[in-house]
Amino acid sequence: MSDAVGGVYPRVDMSGGTNVFPDMERQVLEYWKDDETFKASLTNREENPEYVFYDGPPFANGLPHYGHLLTGYVKDIVPRYQTMKGKLVNRVFGWDCHGLPAELEAEKQLGIKDKGEIEAMGLESFNNYCAKSVLEYTQEWKDYVTRQARWVDFDNGYKTMDMDFMESVMWAFKTLYDKGLIYQGFRVLPYSWAEHTPLSNQETRLDDSYKMRQDPTLTVTFPITGVKDDSAADASLVGAYALAWTTTPWTLPSNLALAVNPQVNYVEVKVGDQGAEAIRGQRVLLAEALVGAYAKELGEDHEVLTVRPGSELVGLTYQPIFSYFADHENAFQILAAEYVTTEDGTGIVHQAPAFGEDDMNTCKEYGIEVVIPVDMDGKFTSLVPEYQGQLVFDANKSIIADLKAAGRVVRHQTIEHSYPHSWRSGEPLIYMALPSWFVEVTKIRDRMVELNKEIDWMPSHIRDGQFGKWLEGARDWNISRNRYWGSPIPVWVSDDENYPRVDVYGSLEELERDFGVRPESLHRPHIDELTRPNPDDPTGKSTMRRVPEVLDCWFESGSMPFAQKHYPFENKDWFDTHSPADFIVEYSGQTRGWFYTLHVLATALFDRPAFKKVVAHGIVLGDDGTKMSKSRRNYPDVNEVFNRDGSDAMRWFLMSSPILRGGNLIVTEQGIREGVRQALLPMWNAYSFLQLYSSKPAQWSVDSSDVLDRYILAKLHDVVAAVGDALDNTDIARACDEVRTFCDALTNWYVRRSRDRFWAGDTEHPEAFYTLYTVLETLTRVTAPLLPMVSEVIWRGLTGERSVHLADFPQADQFPADDDLVRAMDEVRGVCSATSSVRKAHKLRNRLPLPKVTVALPESARLADFADIIRDEVNVKEVALTSDVDSVGRFDVVVNAKVAGPRLCKDVQRAIKAVKSGNYERRGDTVVADGIELVAGEFTERLVAADPDSTTQIDGVDGLVVLDMTLTEELEAEGWAADVIRGLQDARKASGFEVSDRIEVKLVVPEEKKEWALRHTDMIAGEVLATSFEVVTGEPAEHDIVAGVTATVQKV
C-alpha cells in the first residue's frame, strides 16, 4: 500500500471544509456571484447558434411556492444543458404586472370592498398603488430564484406595465382588428360580480375555478294558456301544466320562454291522487323518457293520456311564472331547441336569455329581446322590485318561498355540483349577457389545430388530448375587462350615435398623430383623457372617447414573445429569428392559460406556432395527497429544505419524479432526502474515495485493460449517450433515471470491487485512479444541469478550472463502448444481488463464507470469465454455472385478469385457460397465449423452484440462483476471522489512525476461539496492516472487536 495518500484533491476547494451539502451550495452561489459565471456562460457562446427559451412571467405581488420551484428547475436545466451543447441561451426574467391578481391584492392591502371605493379614491391613485404593490416581492423572488441555483437575467428583464411592452400589445390588438379578428359583441359570458368584470371561457377552466357547491333545484309549473296563430300545436293541451326544471331558481324572474327538443317524445299525463300537491289531478307535460324520474310526483295511479313529438308543442303559450315582463313581445311561448336533452330534468327547459348562451341564441331566433334585471354587483334591479338589491344567490330563498306560496313548485331539492368560481376571488360566477370585445378565435380555430400538430409536447398525449380537444372546441375569446389596472383597449368611439365612428390605434405615433400629444402613460386615467372632435360630425359637437375597458392580462402574457422586445417598433430582425421558441415549460393547467393564449396570438398574428417544444408538468401536492395549504401545514417549508438538505436535493426529488410526465407529486421530507441518497451521496462518496487515496494528480484516460475499468468506462459511454438523448427530448425524469442507475454501478460495484487496487496506491495501479478520475470528471459534466452545485464542487475540485458550466457536455464516442461486457457484468451484478437476497432472508451475514452458488441462466457460459468476481463478491467457495434453468426451477405465467380484462373482454378467459395448460410462448416483453397477445402489466411471472428456500430469480433476466447454505466448522472459523478483521478496522478508525498506518495488535479471545484466531492469524494481520499480531486469553482489552473478543491496537 502507498505510504503517501491524500492531499492532491481538491485542486480548488469549494466545500468550505465541510461535507454538508447546503453549506457547499452557499459557497458555490457566492463564487458564481463574484466570478460572474453566468455572464461568462453567455459571453462564451455569443457567436454560437441560439437556443430560444421563453420564460413565462410570474406575478411579484405574492411569494413563490413549490409550483414555481418545480417549473424553475426545468427552466434552469434545459438552458444549462443546451449551453453545454454549444448554444447561446438567453434567460430573460419578466414580471406579469396587470390584471385582476394585481388589483385584488391592492384592494386587500387598501381595505377596499367594492369598485365605488376605487373610484372615490381616484383611478390615478389606485393604479399608482397597483404599480408599486405588484413588485412588492421582487427581491424575495430574486433571492429564491438565486438560491435554487437558477441562472436568469434580471437586469434586462421586462415588465408588462412598461410603456414599450404596452405599445407592442396595442400593435397586436390593432393588427388583429385590421385582420377582422376582433369585434365587439353582446353575449352571455361568465361574469364575476365580485370583481365587476366578465371573464373568458378559458379562465373558467383554470385550476380551482370549479368547486363543489350546494344549490337548490326546482321543478315548477307553467300553465298552458293558448296557441300561437302560426302554430300547429294542439289546443287541447290548454290547461295542462308544462313542467320545467332549473338549478338556478334566481333566473326564474327573467323567464321569457320554454324550450323543447322537436325530435323527443313528450307525454301528457294525468296526475294521480297521490301525486304532488301542486299538480294533483292536473294534466302535465314532460318528456316520455323522464316519467320514471317523476314517479313520486306523478303518483302511482297516474295515467299517460297522449304521446307526441316536441315539434307539436312548439307555439303553445303559457302563463308567466312572474308578471314582471308579462307584456314582453313574442315571450312566454314554447320554442324548439335541439340542444334540449332528456339526461336530467323534465325535457322542458326554462329560458332566461340574459343568463344562458343557448337561451339567448334560441330566443333571438324567435324575436325575443333580452331583459337583464341584474346589475354589475350581481344584485336584482328595480325591474324586479320584490327582490331588488338582493344578490342573486341570496335571492334564491325568497324566490322559492314565493313560488311555493303560489303553488307553482312540484319538486324542491338540493344538489351538490361542480360550479365555476372566479379564479382569483373564489366567488361563484354568474352567466350574464354583456357587451364585450372578442378575438374571433372561431375564424382561426382550424389553423390553430393544424399548427398544434407541429408542436412537440411532453407528455405527448396532451397535444391531441387536453390541448388538442380544447382547440377543437375553442370559442371566441373575451378579451375586455371592466377594470382599471391594465393595458387599455385602444379603441375610441364617437359619443354621439348619430355620428358613429370607431378608431383603433396600434402605436404611440398614431395616437400622437390624431391627438396632437404623445402619451407619457398608457394607463388609465391618462389614456382616457385623450379626446378629440369626431371628424365625421359636421356639427363639431361629438367627441371621440376611449372605450372604458382594459385588456385581459392573458392577452399580455400571450404577447410576451414579441412585446418583451418592443416588436415591431424595435428588434424586428431579432423576433423574426426568435419565434417560435425552441422550448417553454409550465404546469399542465396552462393548456387553458399561457400555452393557449400564446398559440392563439401566434396563429392570428404570424400564422405559426409560438413554441416548438413544451413540457406541461403535473401538480405538486402536500404530504397528505391534497393541495398544498398553509393552514394544513401539509408540506415542508422551502427554506427549511434548502437549509437542511440543499437545493440540489430538492431539484433531484422533483426532477426525477413522474410529475414531468404529467403526473402529480406528493412532496415529503423523506422523498427529498431520498434525492441525497440516490445521487448526491454516491457522487460525493466516489469523489471522497479518490481524494483519500490519491498521492498525485490523475490523468484523463480511457485505455485501461482491467475488466472493471473497461466495464465502468463502457457504462460511462452509455450514460453519456442516454442522458444526452433524454435531455435532447426534454425527458428530464429519464435523464435522472440514467444517472441514478450509473451511480449505483459506480459506487456499489466499481469502487467497492476496486478497493484493493486503490489501497495498493496510484503507483502500483495508476489505471484505477485514472479511470475513476475520468469517470468523475465526465459524470459531473453529465450531471451539471441536473445537480449544478455539487457537480461544480466536485468538477472544480478535480480539475481546478473555472466552472463545469463553462465546459462542454461530453460526447459518448470519447469512451469505449462494449455492449457484451456491460451486459455480462450487469448480469454478474444481478447474480450477486439475488444471492445476497437469499443470504438476507436466512440472516446469514456476508462475511460468513458458504459452500456454493449455482447460477442457472441461458448461455451461462458467458459469465465464466467472471466466476472469480462472483465468488469473491458473494463469499462462496464455488460458483457453478448451468444453462439448464429447468433443473432448478421454472417461471409460470399468470394472467392479470383485472388489467387484461377491459382490453381483451371475453378473450381474457381463453388466455387464462391457455396459460394454465402451457399453451403459450414468450415473445420479448409480451406473452402470446393461444394466439392472444398479453402486454406488460397483463401478466406476471411466478417462480416455481425445486428448492424454494435457497432459490431466487435474477432481476432482469430469465435466470435463477441456488445458494448452498450448508455450514462447516471451517467455514464458520473463516467467517469469524472476517468479523474480527472488521472489528479491528473499526478500532483503527476509532484510534484516529490513517489508512496507511501500520499497527501492533494484541487480540484477547475466549479459549474456545483461540485456535480459530491462530489458524487465521496471517489473514487477519495482513488485512489490518499489523506488523505484530499476538493472540492471548485473559482480561479484556481496550477495544471491543466481536462477541467475547477485545484488542489493544497501537501505531507502529
UniProtKB/Swiss-Prot annotation:
Record keyword Transmembrane helix present: no
Cellular localisation: Cytoplasm
Record motif 'HIGH' region, residues: 58-68
Keyword Transmembrane helix part of the UniProt annotation: no
PROSITE patterns given in the database record: AA_TRNA_LIGASE_I (PS00178)
InterPro entries registered for this protein in UniProt: aa-tRNA-synth_I_CS (IPR001412), aa-tRNA-synth_Ia (IPR002300), Anticodon_Ile_ABEc (IPR033709), Ile-tRNA-ligase (IPR002301), Ile-tRNA-ligase_type2 (IPR023586), M/V/L/I-tRNA-synth_anticd-bd (IPR013155), Rossmann-like_a/b/a_fold (IPR014729), tRNAsynth_Ia_anticodon-bd (IPR009080)
Cofactor: Zn(2+)
Motif position, 'KMSKS' region: 627-631
Catalytic activity: tRNA(Ile) + L-isoleucine + ATP = L-isoleucyl-tRNA(Ile) + AMP + diphosphate
GO cellular component term of the entry, any: cytoplasm
Amino-acid positions noted as binding ATP in the UniProt annotation, renumbered to this chain: K630
Keywords: Aminoacyl-tRNA synthetase, ATP-binding, Cytoplasm, Ligase, Metal-binding, Nucleotide-binding, Protein biosynthesis, Zinc
GO biological process terms, semicolon-separated: isoleucyl-tRNA aminoacylation
EC id: 6.1.1.5
GO MF term (any one): zinc ion binding
Family recorded in the similarity comment: Belongs to the class-I aminoacyl-tRNA synthetase family. IleS type 2 subfamily.
Domain commentary: IleRS has two distinct active sites: one for aminoacylation and one for editing. The misactivated valine is translocated from the active site to the editing site, which sterically excludes the correctly activated isoleucine. The single editing site contains two valyl binding pockets, one specific for each substrate (Val-AMP or Val-tRNA(Ile)).
HAMAP family: Ile_tRNA_synth_type2
General function of this protein: Catalyzes the attachment of isoleucine to tRNA(Ile). As IleRS can inadvertently accommodate and process structurally similar amino acids such as valine, to avoid such errors it has two additional distinct tRNA(Ile)-dependent editing activities. One activity is designated as 'pretransfer' editing and involves the hydrolysis of activated Val-AMP. The other activity is designated 'posttransfer' editing and involves deacylation of mischarged Val-tRNA(Ile).
Oligomeric and partner information: Monomer.
Protein name, per record: Isoleucine--tRNA ligase
Organism per entry: Corynebacterium diphtheriae (strain ATCC 700971 / NCTC 13129 / Biotype gravis)
Origin organism lineage: Bacteria, Bacillati, Actinomycetota, Actinomycetes, Mycobacteriales
Gene: ileS
